[in-house]
Amino acid sequence: MNKGHVIQVMGPVVDVKFDNGQLPAIYNSLTVKIERPNEEPTILALEVALHLGDDSVRTIAMSSTDGLQRGAEVTDSGKAISVPVGEVTLGRVFNVLGEVIDLGEEIPADARRDSIHREAPTFEELSTTVEILETGIKVVDLLAPYIKGGKIGLFGGAGVGKTVLIQELINNIAQEHSGISVFAGVGERTREGNDLFFEMSDSGVIKQTAMVFGQMNEPPGARMRVALTGLTMAEYFRDEQGADVLLFIDNIFRFTQAGSEVSALLGRMPSAVGYQPTLATEMGKLQERITSTNKGSVTSIQAIYVPADDYTDPAPATTFAHLDATTNLERKLSEMGIYPAVDPLASTSRALSPEIVGAEHYAVATGVQRTIQRYRELQDIIAILGMDELSDEDKQTVERARRIQFFLSQNFHVAEQFTGQKGSYVPVKETVRSFKEILDGKWDHLPEDAFRLVGSIDEVVEKAKSMGVEV
């Protein structure tokens, strides 16, 4: 065993000297025992980041360095961090090192383990077909449909509903498509991860899901690598079992943020807005592994926190370049009580073309966007002069647009305990039919309130009847 000793500790960054001159490879995992008074000794994992010269390496700690002292003995494992993969991971909760943290039984010692650092699939292995993934969420399926094996970004500031949307997607995919999901909690609230685990256990969805957490309270090393741990588990199901896997990452911004926290300590010059100079490379290494191959697919849905709602910030801007579809959450819509608060004009998808979704779907989607765009253009006039100054055609457009805007909202299954309303899953065909009828003016006589937080157009009619309206 190759052994060295700690020569410097700077928070989450630890320098180690190997006197025999045998330096461990970059990304190798090292271990060191931390002994604290009146406590059980703990094993700290370190990952090699830099060779410094003078027989020393600079490493990033995967857990707290409290109690670590200079001179402590360090052992080189001879390989990168490896985590369990396969059926043993389903229904379990792991940390960045692949250790179970759900108080259940340990993973068997003979279970297969894969390195978290792997090459992306080669060009020849990539799939070339485009297939739509039905989510049951109207605004997504109609205006920014998701692609199987694609990368989808959920953009939004703090508290506009990114995590709730992810939970609903996990629920819908598990219930309607019985697919395998991997959830990577990267630098988010521990309480949310805890709630998610118990909610998924109650609904039975957990049996089809592996969960990996490196939350806000953990050092940046864990937050930097936990997305790779989740991705490695997802890749096994794709490559060895030919499955279509969903990888949820909440939140990809925290992955970048963790990288920037250790970047300066590693001795790198900061780049724009203080981010690490290797931002694009780190993001590319992660994103290029998320793809469809000729064996199976990994579809990733990534929540992306937008600092101060500024979309030009380098972290969200770098992520944009990798995405096939974006779902933009808008604070103004959540303030109006429209949930999910998805902006129908800012959200985009590569799949929204007549060749992929079909001519009727494309025509209805563009009709909806055109109507909402016209309504937004008229809002200034309405604010200054009032509705009476509009032409009859514009009045009709405004009334229809308001109905469409309310109809883009719906109740979620995962929010039933808060709203008291039953969640709805709306198939794509039903969504297209419903919006086509609204655009054609078939339901102009129904009150706007009937369109709020419902599923299909048939539910709107039922709601209008319950309000005492002649249908």
Swiss-Prot record:
Keyword Translocase: yes
InterPro entries: AAA+_ATPase, ATP-synt_VA_C, ATP_synth_F1_bsu, ATPase_a/bsu_AS, ATPase_alpha/beta_chains, ATPase_F1/V1/A1_a/bsu_N, ATPase_F1/V1/A1_a/bsu_N_sf, ATPase_F1/V1/A1_a/bsu_nucl-bd
Keywords: ATP synthesis, ATP-binding, Cell membrane, CF(1), Hydrogen ion transport, Ion transport, Membrane, Nucleotide-binding, Translocase, Transport
Pfam families per UniProt: ATP-synt_ab, ATP-synt_ab_N, ATP-synt_VA_C
Family matches, as PROSITE patterns: ATPASE_ALPHA_BETA
Location within or outside the cell: Cell membrane
Role of this protein: Produces ATP from ADP in the presence of a proton gradient across the membrane. The catalytic sites are hosted primarily by the beta subunits.
Record family assignment: Belongs to the ATPase alpha/beta chains family.
Protein name: ATP synthase subunit beta
The organism of origin for this protein: Lysinibacillus sphaericus (strain C3-41)
